[in-house]
Amino acid sequence: MKSQHDSLPSSCSALIAQPSRSGITGTVALADGRYLGYAEYGDPGGWPLVFFHGTPGSRVLARLAAAQARLAGIRLLAPERPGYGLSTPQPGRRLLDWPDDVRQWADALGLDRFAVLGVSGGGPYAAACAWQLPDRVSVAGIVSSLAPKDAMLSSLPRLQQCLAQLVRHTWLTGPALPLLAALARRWPANLITVLAWSLPPADRAILAQPDVQQLHLDSLMEAFRQGSQATAAELALFSRPWGFSVAAVQVPVFLWHGIADRLLPVAMGRYLANQIPDCQARFLPDAGHLWIFQGYLEVLATLRRSAR
């Protein structure tokens, strides 16, 4: 059976597929033969904002801001990292492999200058692109992000420190992730219950909204389309040094982090805000990890207003 990728002629660098929930889905061929899947929402001729999903996650998550992006004249694009959704796996990848993938993908789509927005596990990738592509990235947004390994461990309670150390060993974390994937496919309502169990009240209220639940499930289904290996590899990647200092980022950065975030404690956001030279941070009282679902209007407006 041929996949969408198999049908691409060798000379083709990008393919636009079927319209999807008021957006489009496509793939871009990279120099090494891999493909990056992506979704595009909003105004096709608008100001480009590149959205990096969380872990696990997929291009689908950008749908949360599709309507507002269209009204605001924003071209919202969401590439998927290797192994997620439509993107080809990249064994042994490093955090700093991503900016070059983004550069090639942006070239194929005719994007010269653009903003980046990383949410949760997408935050480190937004920082990496801001550091490595200062000639392409006009402004960066970082929401509810984790921090580099040393700062991450010091900010976590002891039990979570132990769990964070375990993700370095994919043979330990690997068996649990297929169970999460199966839960998403077969018992989605149960998955929402599991996700909500340890969340603060603000996050539980957000996750109780039917449209948010459906968006989460759609994103997870795409995240696990090829299995759980991409998530296991990414968790291990986050436990290693990033390969650059966030103190060397020269692009303007706007950061948001909920003070009540139990998944990635606010200490991580404070670390990034203190280290990044040109960073304006907002720490949100009573907000948890899912604040982006109610705060995306503020984020889009801030980044659009601040782009150079």
Give residue spans per PLM region.
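Short beta-strand/loop motif that positions the catalytic acidic residue
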Residues: 249, 255-257, 261
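Alpha/beta-hydrolase
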Residues: 160-244
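Catalytic active-site module of serine/aspartate enzymes centered on a nucleophile-bearing elbow/loop
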Residues: 278-308
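The serine-hydrolase catalytic nucleophile loop
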Residues: 55-67
